[in-house]
């Protein structure tokens, strides 16, 4: 099915439908999405598969557990960057693809059964890596102009997320992620310069393939909190999108 899709749609990164390996009728991911603030989620995660995601769709990025691409595509984008340990290496790879006009696709006809973060689960180490690596993506993949435009709203999101980290007793990990970014600033700057030289698409074009919402996994909070957070982030994201496009 990947080969058939490639014959039709051409160059790109292709993701299958990920299903849980222990509950084979439950979706793990029907396409991975990036929020304008670099927050990510898996479309359809935790839902019973009744064919609601049996589509072919342009997505923000493909899951690292299984991505299909041609040799030429991989050569253009380059290797996975080792600066991303365990998390967001796939986010970065898909984003870098978009910078080079290489899209990401979800092909539901291909199915892979996947454990899904069995090592760290929702541990403090995972939160640390997710936050640190999210900021590496933001600082290196957005242009400086875009970062300046959305910085005030990014700051609001960060302050809001502090409450979540305090609730989950992971504030220390959040603070550690900031200090880790500071330690990596030289590498981040070098990486950004390299990416800026090769990028083809502007951020205005890139964010067309990003989303505004961010539904927190119910496994980490309750439904009411998830809906409230999603509403606030969606509003801020839409405003950021307007600023980027201005």
Please provide the spans of the model-predicted regions.
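Active-site-adjacent helix/loop segment of glycosyltransferases
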Residues: 100-208, 230
